Amino acid sequence: MLYTVFCDESCHLQKDNSSVMVLGAMYCLSEKRKQIYSDIRAIKEKHGLNSHFEIKWTKVSESKIEFYLELLDYFWENSDLHYRGLVATGKDKLNHAKYNNDDYDLWYYKMYFRTLDPIIRQENEYHILVDIKDTKGGKRIQKLKEVMCNNIYDFNGEV
């Protein structure tokens, strides 16, 4: 089966004055994706929002609370949607010199591995959408894919 995985992060920059980083992965069978998109657009329009309005928790406000509550109900009630999140605490206390070749971004992608690894199964295929963090992000994402495939003995990168 083919799955689509949507990834996002919060407080992921090294010097953002936050000791916590959150990574999330929402996923569904790819064949269900269009219906889910359509349902979410309809919820936005029902609440007077543009159908292309970007959903962000920082945009939650008293005037949009009913929209966000209905959206949460939709996520909890839709058995086609699945979610995995990772909360990394103590981000400001990490010793990157000792554990990550003095490279914060290496730690960042290790956390993405920890987020996605429990989702990935050898018998399925995945279309994983990850924000490219910076100009080095494309290469890092390719390396993440290679490591994830190797972890499930997919040395040809077919998953």
Regions found by a protein language model. Give the residues of each.
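Phosphate-ester processing/binding pockets and catalytic centers
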Residues: 1-159
